[in-house]
């Protein structure tokens, strides 16, 4: 019996999940790295144009690049250091018929040779400091979430080197580590353009923030906050729209 493409590409230890009402399909490890809520939020936050050349620093299973594929751009290069995740990301790109728009490169982003500059650079960086927090039994998940292979300072340095003069970079990062993020920015020529705090509930503290950076902004714009839940188990209308893949400008 002839196997369909899903069966050919899917590993035994993986699940097949759908997003944006089935427009995007992604294989994920059952016990290894699985993306979290910050991925679709960052994909929504990134703004693109049809001619954009884009670079992702640390793609994991490719989820962010694939969610971004519903937006216009010319080509996206996605870097991933872990062989298992790079392979998974490549299979996910093929699963979604995006081979002509997205290229996965297995490499250490700290030593990636930038042969050109990019219009857009984005990243959902590892956010747990070395020697802080509990390491997952899954080495794959630990490298994705802990600063074992690169730090926020490495991410910012590579972004500075990769971004065009008129380009823009986008990140999502824990609010508790904002000071580290700002120090990493200040070590480069990058400047914070927009910040949007993400709150679980209206009366809670932010758990992370979305931020855009460029080389020319003189004043930071604080965007209206994003609240995820109306109440426990019920997303706000905006969160539902983001999870459905509705394209909009978060700066509006």
Model-inferred region functions:
Residues 33-35, 60-61, 203-204:
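Short glycine/threonine-rich catalytic loop with a Thr-x-Gly-x-Asp
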Residues 125-154:
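Mobile active-site "lid"/loop adjacent to the S-adenosyl-L-methionine
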């Amino acid at each position: 019996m002839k196997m369909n493409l899903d069966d050919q590409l899917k590993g035994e230890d993986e699940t097949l999940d759908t997003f944006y009402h089935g427009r995007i399909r992604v294989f994920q490890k059952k016990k290894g790295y699985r993306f979290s809520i910050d991925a679709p939020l960052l994909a929504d936050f990134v703004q693109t144009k049809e001619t954009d050349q884009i670079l992702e620093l640390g793609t994991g299973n490719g989820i962010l690049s694939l969610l971004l594929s519903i937006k216009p751009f010319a080509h996206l290069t996605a870097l991933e250091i872990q062989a298992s995740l790079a392979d998974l990301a490549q299979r996910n790109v093929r699963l979604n018929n995006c081979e002509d728009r997205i290229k996965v490169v297995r490499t250490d982003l700290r030593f990636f040779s930038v042969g050109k500059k990019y219009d857009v650079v984005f990243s959902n960086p590892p956010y747990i400091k070395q020697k802080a927090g509990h390491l997952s039994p899954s080495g794959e998940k630990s490298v994705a979430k802990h600063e074992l292979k690169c730090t926020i300072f490495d991410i910012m340095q590579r972004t500075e080197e990769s971004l065009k003069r008129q380009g823009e970079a986008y990140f999502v990062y824990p609010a508790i580590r904002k000071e580290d993020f700002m120090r990493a920015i200040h070590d480069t020529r990058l400047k914070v353009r927009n910040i949007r705090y993400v709150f679980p509930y209206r009366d809670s503290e932010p758990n992370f923030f979305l931020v855009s950076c460029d080389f020319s902004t003189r004043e930071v714009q604080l965007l209206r906050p994003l609240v995820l839940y109306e109440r426990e188990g019920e997303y706000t209308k905006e969160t539902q729209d983001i999870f459905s893949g509705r394209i909009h400008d978060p700066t509006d």
